[in-house]
């Protein structure tokens, strides 16, 4: 398959071929080239192998700040541009919906962005003018269509479809599901996570709590891996209030689920205590493993296939000083599978690990980014890193520590060198959360 760079054109015919090849890979479990720009994006998307032109930032609105609405902010990151490092466009969606995660469709023509509080999904056209996305559709019946799933957590590209993990259900507990839509926004199916009462045929290692969070796929092994967080009754509460509620703190995920992806069938429920969040599969053709981090126990975990073909999970490293409650949040694995970036919210720090031996991570750098820290996005070539600050509107810090920023760095394998930063509060934009990359050349005819 010819890889499309940011200097090349992606014609309708080529887009069709890419979609067709991806579909074949989906059905056959074939291993094709890694297809993504940020290394955590879906393998079913064409990747940017040159430099990204724009960073799209899905941003939480703040009452009394600008228009107060959630918005998609476009940041210019083109070298030599007169607006380099500046927010050049923002598209408000009207109101606050707890903007959180999102993702591109497989043809990269749309960006789907989800709201955790009211379960709305906003669909942006990023192809017509990549510098100025347009809101073209809103899905406002997610709970009804899905049969009761709530809290859509981003969107993950499948060939012609979007996979949307939920965090909750209509009763606001942690019972979660995976929901599929077609690229035109038509509901297709709901797949509920296994529980102790309804294991759905899965082998349970210790418990099946039914919580959901992330979902990531390793196509060549026909494996999907999901992680677990908490329900709406917890994630919309003020963090300090919730942390003092002993019963609330029991309502967090302790599991990861391995699925037969083609069949959408849960096969094995792994015990991963401490709230495993982001899932990052290795990219190498023989690297059958994924990393996650646990928010409440500050550990790096490895989910791997052993020599006998069995899937297992084990903790492989501490994050920061044990017992300090760093709260690991986002992670990013480099395209060569050698470097893992781990962000911790409470101390605003990113830690970089050599994971050449995935069973024995070694920390090689620790750098404070800000008073608080959440997301990290990495360019495919591993040379540029972007960081944002907000976790959830009711969980972010207050006062002087409530820094809201996008910060960009260059990475040479040893140090992170600042490139630019944007103060989202000073710009009256809001709380920046999830990032995604764009390149104008993808859509040039």
Model-derived regions, located:
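Asp-box/WD-like beta-propeller blade repeats and closely related beta-sheet repeat scaffolds
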Residues: 126-219
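Blade-loop segments of beta-propeller domains
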Residues: 84-154
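Beta-propeller domains
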Residues: 105, 205-351
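Beta-strand-rich domains and repeat architectures in extracellular enzymes and scaffolds
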Residues: 37-78, 83-116
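Short, conserved, GDST-rich strand-edge loop motifs in beta-rich repeat architectures
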Residues: 44, 50-67, 164-175, 227-251, ...
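A short beta-strand motif characteristic of beta-propeller blades
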Residues: 87-93, 134-145, 187-205, 265-270, ...
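Beta-rich, blade/repeat-based domains predominating
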Residues: 39-46, 67, 94-106, 144-161, ...
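Short loop/turn segments immediately following beta-strands, especially the blade-tip
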Residues: 75-83, 123-133, 180-188, 261-263, ...
């Amino acid at each position: 398959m010819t890889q499309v760079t940011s200097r090349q054109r992606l014609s309708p015919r080529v887009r069709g071929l890419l979609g067709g090849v991806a579909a074949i890979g989906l059905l056959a479990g074939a291993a094709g080239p890694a297809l993504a720009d940020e290394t955590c994006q879906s393998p079913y998307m064409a990747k940017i192998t040159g430099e990204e032109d724009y960073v799209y930032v899905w941003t939480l609105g703040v009452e009394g700040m600008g228009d107060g609405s959630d918005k998609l902010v476009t940041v210019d990151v083109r070298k030599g541009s007169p607006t380099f490092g500046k927010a050049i466009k923002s598209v408000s969606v009207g109101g606050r919906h707890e903007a959180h995660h999102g993702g591109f469709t497989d043809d990269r023509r749309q960006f789907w962005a989800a709201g955790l509080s009211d379960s709305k999904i906003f669909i942006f056209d990023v192809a017509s003018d990549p510098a100025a996305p347009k809101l073209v559709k809103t899905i406002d019946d997610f709970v009804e269509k899905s049969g009761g799933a709530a809290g859509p957590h981003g969107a993950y590209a499948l060939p012609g479809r979007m996979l949307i993990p939920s965090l909750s259900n209509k009763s606001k507990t942690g019972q979660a599901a995976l929901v599929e839509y077609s690229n035109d926004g038509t509901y297709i199916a709901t797949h509920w996570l296994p529980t102790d009462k309804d294991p759905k045929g899965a082998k349970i290692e210790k418990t099946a709590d039914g919580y959901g969070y992330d979902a990531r796929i390793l196509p060549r092994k026909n494996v999907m891996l999901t992680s677990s967080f908490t329900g709406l009754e917890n994630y919309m509460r003020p963090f300090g209030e919730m942390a003092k509620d002993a019963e609330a703190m029991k309502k967090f995920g302790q599991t990861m689920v391995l699925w037969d992806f083609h069949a959408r069938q849960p096969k094995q429920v792994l015990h991963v205590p401490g709230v495993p969040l982001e899932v990052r599969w290795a990219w190498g053709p023989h690297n059958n493993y994924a990393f996650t981090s646990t928010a409440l126990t500050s550990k790096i975990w490895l989910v791997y296939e052993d020599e006998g073909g069995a899937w297992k999970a084990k903790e492989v490293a501490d994050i920061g000083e044990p017992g300090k409650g760093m709260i690991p949040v986002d992670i990013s694995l480099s395209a060569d599978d050698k470097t893992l970036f781990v962000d911790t919210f409470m101390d605003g720090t990113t830690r970089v690990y050599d994971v050449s031996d995935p069973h024995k991570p070694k920390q090689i750098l620790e750098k404070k980014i800000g008073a608080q820290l959440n997301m990290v996005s990495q360019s495919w070539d591993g040379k540029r890193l972007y960081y944002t600050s907000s976790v959830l509107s009711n969980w972010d810090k207050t006062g002087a520590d409530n820094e809201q920023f996008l910060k960009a760095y260059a990475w040479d394998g040893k140090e992170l060198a600042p490139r630019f930063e944007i103060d989202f509060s000073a710009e009256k934009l809001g709380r920046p959360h999830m990032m995604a990359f764009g390149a104008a050349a993808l859509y040039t005819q």
